[in-house]
From Swiss-Prot:
Modified sites of kind N-acetylalanine: 1
Residue numbers carrying Citrulline: 23, 29, 41, 47, 63, 96, 106, 112, 129, 158, 161, 168-169
Membrane topology reported for the UniProt record: Peripheral membrane protein
List of residues that carry Phosphotyrosine: 12, 67
UniProtKB keywords: Acetylation, Autoimmune encephalomyelitis, Cell membrane, Citrullination, Membrane, Methylation, Phosphoprotein
Species this chain originates from: Bos taurus
Gene that this sequence comes from: MBP
Quaternary structure, from the entry: Homodimer; self-associates in the presence of lysolipid.
GO CC terms: cell periphery; compact myelin; internode region of axon; myelin sheath; neuronal cell body; plasma membrane; protein-containing complex
Annotated spans, Induces experimental autoimmune encephalomyelitis (EAE) 2: 114-122
A single GO BP: myelination
PTM-bearing positions, type N6-acetyllysine: 121
Matching PANTHER family: MYELIN BASIC PROTEIN
Protein name: Myelin basic protein
Length: 169
């Protein structure tokens, strides 16, 4: 029984990442859609349940630790392609996630809901968070980007997570 359990567990993990890999690997379009779909379902349920979708959380293990998990997942599956891409999206897309995602129906309600839910300006769109609002007006674009990035990772992991793949679509 002891031997069966780890093998079963690794099998489960492998199957999970294999599915991911298949989704990642087929076409770039397919890969993004797969990620988006899983993340969309992820966030949809997350929004509905304040417990942060713990059920799916275990499966993806990417919700709370999404910062480490996203690059890790990428490294495991597509080291050359996904990693820089993820990195790029983290640095570039995250700060300006809300505007592009507002064009997508789901992204709109999603980003507005989650940003607004944290007590910031829901309709602001660009930064949403109060400090981003200030720094954006100060014109510190680069700093704002970094601030938004770390803030998102720290405060609203779900925002950056929803944002980056959203913007990828």
């Amino acid at each position: 029984a002891a031997q069966k359990r780890p093998s079963q567990r690794s099998k489960y993990l492998a199957s999970a990442s294999t599915m991911d890999h298949a989704r990642h690997g087929f076409l770039p379009r397919h890969r993004d859609t797969g990620i988006l779909d899983s993340l969309g379902r992820f966030f949809g349920s997350d929004r509905g349940a304040p417990k942060r979708g713990s059920g799916k959380d275990g499966h993806h293990a990417a919700r709370t630790t999404h910062y480490g998990s996203l690059p890790q997942k990428a490294q495991g599956h597509r080291p050359q392609d996904e990693n820089p891409v993820v990195h790029f999206f983290k640095n570039i897309v995250t700060p300006r996630t809300p505007p592009p995602s507002q064009g997508k129906g789901r992204g709109l309600s999603l980003s507005r809901f989650s940003w607004g839910a944290e007590g910031q300006k829901p309709g602001f769109g660009y930064g949403g968070r109060a400090s981003d609002y200030k720094s954006a007006h100060k014109g510190l674009k680069g700093h704002d980007a970094q601030g938004t990035l770390s803030k998102i990772f720290k405060l609203g992991g779900r925002d950056s997570r929803s944002g980056s793949p959203m913007a990828r679509r």
